């Protein structure tokens, strides 16, 4: 093992030296990159082990080394060295390690740890800027910055906040922008990738390219939702808005799926400027369960809402989840607005549950649940998550085939989200693949396997088997679903995933990462694509 380590360090030394970057030993298992801001290359077993795992805990792949950059120049120098090497060493960016199936891993390559970059220090962060041309504020952030830190910073400097969110805020900016970034605000603001003005991207050639809708648009839109295939996002210019002070958070139960989805779709169709909710989600609940789930602490632990009390509604239930934002100027009308909006919905009478909390507490709700699960040793367990975009025209078939078919009452293991989005809020020039209907649903099976559980339904094997059954049903029934945070095993499956957009994606890959070195953990390209394929 020792000789492998020596060879590995020597190999990386040679790679870096070929582009003129001086290297000096730091300790027995790390080296310092000089002249580019202090990036550090580590082969410490603890660093390598951490980079070989992710949140999913489903796969493991050890890199040769982990690189800790101080800025985009460091990232570019490393990628340029790898690009110029004889074999084209694999390079993957890692934010907070929240991938599910090894997407940010780099077996036998180098993982770039983006979590401690040059904007991660408060003294080096930029302040929000008002742009008359854009008609609003924005902020430039490091690609490895966590969204929770962006939120806290912008709130403290102008009472501002990003417009679009994910449910969990301890994710990196570059990570979510490489996928899409969605939550209950997406029906109105679009995903996070629709709320970005500009990027700096380190391409697979080691070049730092600034791009936007009008400047290098192919790279800009290709990188947004591009699964890290075209480059590493080192800077993002994020749209901001004035942050509300408080949130009225409401849940209501349905037993009729058609009424549930009709109400959801009506709510996301309401126009801005009129009376509407600011966030629309929902989830599936087994009749013997609780309306609470690990994603939030909606109710007091001393007073949970037991669904078994709904004696006349057996089987699968559906929970609508909405919020209304307000501040001092609108506090006097929030009750009236909520009452009017709820008055047009068809939930089960007597099943409306409401709470009120600060805006930040609502956005950070999942983290509070994370802390509880960590305390019980239930956070770092396998997470065989499955996220699907389902066209609205087939969501009723999906309900019959999956919620009432494959799953039945076996919904243990974690929440199952379901909520619609408006396709016109997604820019078709991005790399994200969605169903080609005006409205489509996210259906997210966010289950956790419980090691040592006496319930076989909560085992990893059982949950992965259910995932396969769900995907098989979608294929056999022609549902037309597309995976979000996709996980495919072969290039032909990726070609089917992208469909008519594959040729463009392969062309962009050949242009910006011609040696196919970046984000190989995604498993998209078996070999470097040829420009002729476009």
From Swiss-Prot:
<feature type="binding site">
    <location>
        <position position="95"/>
    </location>
    <ligand>
        <name>FAD</name>
    </ligand>
</feature>
<keyword id="KW-0325">Glycoprotein</keyword>
<dbReference type="InterPro" id="IPR036318">
    <property type="entry name" value="FAD-bd_PCMH-like_sf"/>
</dbReference>
<dbReference type="GO" id="GO:0005576">
    <property type="term" value="C:extracellular region"/>
</dbReference>
<feature type="binding site">
    <location>
        <position position="99"/>
    </location>
    <ligand>
        <name>FAD</name>
    </ligand>
</feature>
<feature type="binding site">
    <location>
        <position position="233"/>
    </location>
    <ligand>
        <name>FAD</name>
    </ligand>
</feature>
<dbReference type="InterPro" id="IPR016170">
    <property type="entry name" value="Cytok_DH_C_sf"/>
</dbReference>
<dbReference type="Pfam" id="PF09265">
    <property type="entry name" value="Cytokin-bind"/>
</dbReference>
<feature type="modified residue" description="Pros-8alpha-FAD histidine">
    <location>
        <position position="98"/>
    </location>
</feature>
<dbReference type="InterPro" id="IPR050432">
    <property type="entry name" value="FAD-linked_Oxidoreductases_BP"/>
</dbReference>
<dbReference type="InterPro" id="IPR015345">
    <property type="entry name" value="Cytokinin_DH_FAD/cytokin-bd"/>
</dbReference>
<dbReference type="GO" id="GO:0071949">
    <property type="term" value="F:FAD binding"/>
</dbReference>
<comment type="subunit">
    <text>Monomer.</text>
</comment>
<dbReference type="Pfam" id="PF01565">
    <property type="entry name" value="FAD_binding_4"/>
</dbReference>
<comment type="similarity">
    <text>Belongs to the oxygen-dependent FAD-linked oxidoreductase family.</text>
</comment>
<feature type="binding site">
    <location>
        <position position="178"/>
    </location>
    <ligand>
        <name>FAD</name>
    </ligand>
</feature>
<dbReference type="InterPro" id="IPR016169">
    <property type="entry name" value="FAD-bd_PCMH_sub2"/>
</dbReference>
<feature type="binding site">
    <location>
        <position position="93"/>
    </location>
    <ligand>
        <name>FAD</name>
    </ligand>
</feature>
<keyword id="KW-0285">Flavoprotein</keyword>
<feature type="binding site">
    <location>
        <position position="484"/>
    </location>
    <ligand>
        <name>FAD</name>
    </ligand>
</feature>
<feature type="binding site">
    <location>
        <position position="97"/>
    </location>
    <ligand>
        <name>FAD</name>
    </ligand>
</feature>
<feature type="glycosylation site" description="N-linked (GlcNAc...) asparagine">
    <location>
        <position position="152"/>
    </location>
</feature>
<dbReference type="InterPro" id="IPR016164">
    <property type="entry name" value="FAD-linked_Oxase-like_C"/>
</dbReference>
<dbReference type="InterPro" id="IPR016167">
    <property type="entry name" value="FAD-bd_PCMH_sub1"/>
</dbReference>
<dbReference type="GO" id="GO:0009690">
    <property type="term" value="P:cytokinin metabolic process"/>
</dbReference>
<protein>
    <recommendedName>
        <fullName>Cytokinin dehydrogenase 5</fullName>
        <ecNumber>1.5.99.12</ecNumber>
    </recommendedName>
</protein>
<keyword id="KW-0560">Oxidoreductase</keyword>
<dbReference type="InterPro" id="IPR016166">
    <property type="entry name" value="FAD-bd_PCMH"/>
</dbReference>
<dbReference type="InterPro" id="IPR006094">
    <property type="entry name" value="Oxid_FAD_bind_N"/>
</dbReference>
<feature type="binding site">
    <location>
        <position position="103"/>
    </location>
    <ligand>
        <name>FAD</name>
    </ligand>
</feature>
<feature type="binding site">
    <location>
        <position position="522"/>
    </location>
    <ligand>
        <name>FAD</name>
    </ligand>
</feature>
<keyword id="KW-0964">Secreted</keyword>
<comment type="function">
    <text>Catalyzes the oxidation of cytokinins, a family of N(6)-substituted adenine derivatives that are plant hormones, where the substituent is an isopentenyl group.</text>
</comment>
<feature type="binding site">
    <location>
        <position position="172"/>
    </location>
    <ligand>
        <name>FAD</name>
    </ligand>
</feature>
<feature type="signal peptide">
    <location>
        <begin position="1"/>
        <end position="20"/>
    </location>
</feature>
<dbReference type="InterPro" id="IPR006093">
    <property type="entry name" value="Oxy_OxRdtase_FAD_BS"/>
</dbReference>
<keyword id="KW-0274">FAD</keyword>
<feature type="binding site">
    <location>
        <position position="167"/>
    </location>
    <ligand>
        <name>FAD</name>
    </ligand>
</feature>
<feature type="binding site">
    <location>
        <position position="182"/>
    </location>
    <ligand>
        <name>FAD</name>
    </ligand>
</feature>
<feature type="domain" description="FAD-binding PCMH-type">
    <location>
        <begin position="59"/>
        <end position="243"/>
    </location>
</feature>
<dbReference type="GO" id="GO:0016491">
    <property type="term" value="F:oxidoreductase activity"/>
</dbReference>
<dbReference type="GO" id="GO:0019139">
    <property type="term" value="F:cytokinin dehydrogenase activity"/>
</dbReference>
């Amino acid at each position: 093992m020792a000789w492998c380590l020596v060879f590995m360090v020597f190999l990386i030394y040679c790679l870096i030296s070929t582009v003129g970057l001086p290297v000096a030993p730091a300790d027995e298992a790390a080296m310092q990159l000089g002249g580019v801001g202090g990036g550090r290359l580590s082969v410490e077993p603890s660093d390598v082990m951490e980079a070989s795992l992710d949140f999913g805990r489903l796969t493991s792949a050890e890199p040769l080394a982990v690189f800790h950059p101080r800025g985009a120049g460091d990232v570019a120098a490393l990628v340029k060295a790898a690009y110029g090497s004889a074999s084209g060493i694999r390079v993957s960016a890692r934010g907070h390690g929240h991938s599910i199936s090894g997407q940010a891993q780099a077996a036998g390559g180098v993982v770039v740890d983006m979590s401690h970059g040059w904007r991660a220090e408060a003294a080096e962060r930029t302040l929000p800027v008002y742009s008359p041309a854009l008609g609003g504020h924005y902020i430039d952030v490091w690609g490895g910055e966590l969204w929770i830190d962006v939120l806290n910073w912008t709130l403290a400097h102008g009472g501002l906040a990003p417009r679009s969110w994910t449910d969990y805020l301890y994710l990196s900016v570059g990570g979510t922008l490489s996928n899409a970034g969605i939550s209950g605000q997406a029906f109105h603001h679009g995903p996070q990738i629709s709320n970005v003005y500009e990027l700096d991207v380190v391409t697979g050639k080691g070049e730092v390219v600034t791009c936007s809708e009008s400047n290098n648009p192919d790279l800009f839109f290709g990188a947004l939702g591009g699964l890290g295939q075209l480059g590493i996002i080192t800077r993002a210019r994020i749209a901001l808005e004035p942050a509300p002070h408080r949130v009225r958070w409401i849940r209501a139960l349905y037993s009729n799926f058609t009424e549930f989805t009709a109400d959801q779709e009506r709510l996301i169709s309401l126009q801005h400027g009129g009376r509407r909710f600011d966030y629309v989600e929902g989830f599936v609940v087994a009749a013997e369960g609780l309306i609470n789930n690990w994603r939030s602490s909606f109710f007091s632990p001393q007073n949970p809402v037991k669904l078994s009390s709904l004696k006349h509604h057996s089987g699968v239930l559906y929970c609508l989840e909405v919020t209304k934002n307000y501040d001092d100027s609108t506090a006097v009308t929030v009750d009236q607005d909520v009452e009017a909006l709820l008055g047009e919905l068809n939930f089960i009478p007597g099943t409306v549950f409401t709470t009120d909390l600060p805006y930040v507490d609502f956005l950070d709700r999942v983290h509070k649940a994370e802390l509880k699960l960590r305390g019980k040793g239930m956070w770092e367990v396998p997470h065989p998550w499955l996220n699907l975009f389902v066209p609205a025209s087939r969501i009723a078939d999906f309900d019959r085939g999956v919620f009432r078919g494959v799953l039945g009452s076996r919904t243990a293991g974690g929440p199952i989200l379901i909520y619609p989005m408006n396709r016109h809020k997604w820019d078709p020039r991005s790399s994200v693949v969605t169903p080609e209907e005006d409205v489509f649903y996210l259906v997210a099976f966010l289950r956790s396997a419980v090691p040592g559980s006496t319930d076989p339904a909560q085992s990893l094997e059982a949950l992965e088997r259910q995932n396969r059954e769900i995907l098989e049903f979608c294929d056999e029934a022609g549902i037309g679903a597309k995976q979000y945070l996709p996980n495919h095993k072969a290039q032909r499956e990726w070609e089917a995933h992208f469909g008519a957009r594959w040729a463009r994606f392969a062309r962009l890959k050949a242009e910006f990462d011609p040696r196919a070195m970046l984000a190989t953990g995604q498993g998209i390209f078996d070999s470097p694509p040829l420009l002729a394929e476009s």
